[in-house]
């Protein structure tokens, strides 16, 4: 949850990533629940209702945004024309800054000519699924003469050639299994497309997959774009859980990708990358069987290019519907963290510790033992929240915005609730098993452990609108987290790298 802030966005600000003006007729619109409020003397503010946020704007900023709404976008040229004295490059930098803050939504331009795309499917076994995958690719709503479909048969037994008879694909057969990463790299080296699109043979592409995602690469700064990965219609508790909790689905909101962003990586089953960038970065790390997609995105980011997630361009993945398979895969994913931290030591995990929330949890543990001390902790936490509210209200009044006290209080409560949610998620994912064990040995800690480990699944069950019961969802959530945690420990021990368990601590007042 973003804290309430007030700041000045100067008219001359140009972001360092803006190397060229956006191409074509890319459009910008206000994000949902965001409004431009004009003030006196030409200035004003950009106001977000949820999360509660206010950004002060000068006259140029108000002029640029005055014609935008949440329902209709405008091109950069149309926006820049509102303030003729401002250069289009400066206007582009200003809009990009707001997009990064998720206050604006960028709608990519449709290319004048669709670029050639090589679609690469690295396959091992699953002949029927491989044929179905290729058939979905042949049904894409994209100029057929601009598509090359390449299937790398990574030493399948029996070979996949028989399953692909009659389909116009380029089949590369390997007699020795080299793994998905190396197989993809092999195909990329021989591909003829300007763009490389990756998916897996247990996936089905939506008809608009390429048309939805390729336009984002009209921005010369974006090197990789990826879309949503969803599951088929769910039947059963495990399938219903995986449908809303799959680590391949990056959610409903698009935006920049990076280790410090809301979306940290893009899965390789729905990934489009510029071929020249892919080859310059030497492709996927061939020695990685897991986490290779995270590693690729982070290396591309390190080169100075951008990676973007679009909540469109969907791929349907055949999710695991059996509990054992789901837990094994989560453990495998967890085991890749140590390898990734070894390769990217600067991308360590950050753990935010909310001071007021920790005081409330400490009071919960102390109450049976020393209730006066617990009451004092509760009073201190409440006082901290009250002071926070007073400061924010004063800050809002200074920029001319009157927010009702009830609305401000609700915003602060949501913010602290979100902090507790993220704390609970981190603790459950990385330390849940020892916390549970210590709680059994020292019962006063049980209520604290219960709150920490119940808040995230209860919130997710409601937020994600899971089809299974709350009790089943909580149980599967805990099992999933325990499996991932064991995988993290396994990877740490194997690589003798313990950074995944030692996050950077950031305190929140």
Feature-to-residue mapping (PLM):
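Short aromatic/hydrophobic "clamp" motif used to bind/position activated sugar donors
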Residues: 196
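A conserved acidic beta->alpha catalytic loop
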Residues: 153-161, 176, 203
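Acidic, low-complexity/disordered tracts enriched in E/D and polar residues
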Residues: 1-67
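Short, acidic, metal-binding catalytic loop of nucleotide-sugar glycosyltransferases
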Residues: 135-146
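N-proximal low-complexity "stem/linker" segments adjacent to membrane-targeting elements
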Residues: 50-64, 81-136
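Active-site-adjacent helix/loop segment of glycosyltransferases
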Residues: 310-374, 390-468, 472-480, 486-490, ...
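Glycine-rich, basic loop-to-helix element that forms the pyrophosphate-binding segment
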Residues: 174-191, 201, 212, 252-264, ...
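Conserved donor NDP-sugar-binding/catalytic core segment of glycosyltransferases
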Residues: 208-240, 318
């Amino acid at each position: 949850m973003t804290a309430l802030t007030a700041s000045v966005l100067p008219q001359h600000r140009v972001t360092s990533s803006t190397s060229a003006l956006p191409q074509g007729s890319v459009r910008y619109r206000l994000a949902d629940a965001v409004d431009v409020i004009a003030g006196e003397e030409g200035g004003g503010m950009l106001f977000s209702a949820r999360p509660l946020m206010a950004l002060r704007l000068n006259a140029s900023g108000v002029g640029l945004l005055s014609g935008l709404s949440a329902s209709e976008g405008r091109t950069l040229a149309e926006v820049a024309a509102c303030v003729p004295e401002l250069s289009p490059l400066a206007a582009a930098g200003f809009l990009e800054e707001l997009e990064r803050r998720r206050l604006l939504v960028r709608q990519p331009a449709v290319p004048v000519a669709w670029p050639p795309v090589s679609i690469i499917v690295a396959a091992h076994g699953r002949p029927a699924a491989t044929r179905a995958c290729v058939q979905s690719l042949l049904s894409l709503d994209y100029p057929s003469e601009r598509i090359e479909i390449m299937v790398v048969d990574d030493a399948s037994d029996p070979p996949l050639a028989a399953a692909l008879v009659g389909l116009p694909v380029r089949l590369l057969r390997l007699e020795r299994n080299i793994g998905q990463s190396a197989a993809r790299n092999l195909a990329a080296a021989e591909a003829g497309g300007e763009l490389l699109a990756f998916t897996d043979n247990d996936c089905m592409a939506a008809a608009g997959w390429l048309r939805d995602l390729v336009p984002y690469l009209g921005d010369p700064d974006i090197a990789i774009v990826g879309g949503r990965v969803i599951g088929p219609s769910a039947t059963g508790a495990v399938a219903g859980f995986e449908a809303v909790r799959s680590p391949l689905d990056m959610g409903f909101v698009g935006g920049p990708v990076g280790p410090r962003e809301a979306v940290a990586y893009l899965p390789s089953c729905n990934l489009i990358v510029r071929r020249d960038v892919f080859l310059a970065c030497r492709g996927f790390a061939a020695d990685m069987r897991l986490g290779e997609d995270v590693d690729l995105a982070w290396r591309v980011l390190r080169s100075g290019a951008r990676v973007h997630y679009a909540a469109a361009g969907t791929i349907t993945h055949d999710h695991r519907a059996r509990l054992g398979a789901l837990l094994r895969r989560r453990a495998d994913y967890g085991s890749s963290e140590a390898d990734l931290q070894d390769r990217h030591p600067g991308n360590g995990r950050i753990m935010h510790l909310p001071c007021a929330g920790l005081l409330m949890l400490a009071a919960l543990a102390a109450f049976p033992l020393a209730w006066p001390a617990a009451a004092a902790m509760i009073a201190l936490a409440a006082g901290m929240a009250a002071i926070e509210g007073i400061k924010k209200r004063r800050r809002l009044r200074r920029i001319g915005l009157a927010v009702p006290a009830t609305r401000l209080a609700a915003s602060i409560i949501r913010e602290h609730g979100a902090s507790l949610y993220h704390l609970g998620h981190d603790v459950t994912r990385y330390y849940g098993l020892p916390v549970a064990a210590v709680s059994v040995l020292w019962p006063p800690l049980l209520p604290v452990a219960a709150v920490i480990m119940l808040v995230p699944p209860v919130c997710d069950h409601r937020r994600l609108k899971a089809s299974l019961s709350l009790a089943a969802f909580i149980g599967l959530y805990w099992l999933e987290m325990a499996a991932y945690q064991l995988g993290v420990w396994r990877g740490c021990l194997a690589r003798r790298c313990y950074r995944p368990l030692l996050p950077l601590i950031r305190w929140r007042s």
